[in-house]
Amino acid sequence: MKTVATFVALGLTLLAFSALSDDKSFIEKAAQGGMAEVEAGELAANKATNQEVRKFGMTMAKEHGAANKKLADLAKSKGIELPDSMGEKHMETLETLQATDGPRFDAKYMEDMVKGHEEMVQLLKDEIASGQDAAVKAFAQEMLPTVESHLKEARRLTGKQSAASTY
């Protein structure tokens, strides 16, 4: 009987650790995505040739910067250390953007914004559906409408950029 109780306790401990690990993974991925959005947004604000793309970049830098601050405060309250960098995948995307100019930059940036926001929407929905920490889930719920709005605007601008780059 004591052995069964030990296994049950161990199982519950592993489940709790797994849940914490999933919430921690969400925070880390959201932080990396947020860092990438700010960097790419600042780049677009300075480099885009289309005024709407430039404005979108400024909005991304500002709004994701504010979200990053909220996320940092949340992570600190949970004792979770945020990553120091945006990660290799995001860095490669940023390097490609830095090497691209003119209308091609605008189109590439907007395509990257659609893809990045689609991934972030899914990440947020996954956390809302299966996250264990109420505060982390609440953060995801709070951010979802904004990220969905960014995605909608990115898709709209991507359509414009595709049409403009074919002429």
Model-derived features: positions:
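His/Met- and acidic-residue-enriched segments that coordinate or traffic transition-metal cofactors
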Residues: 2-167
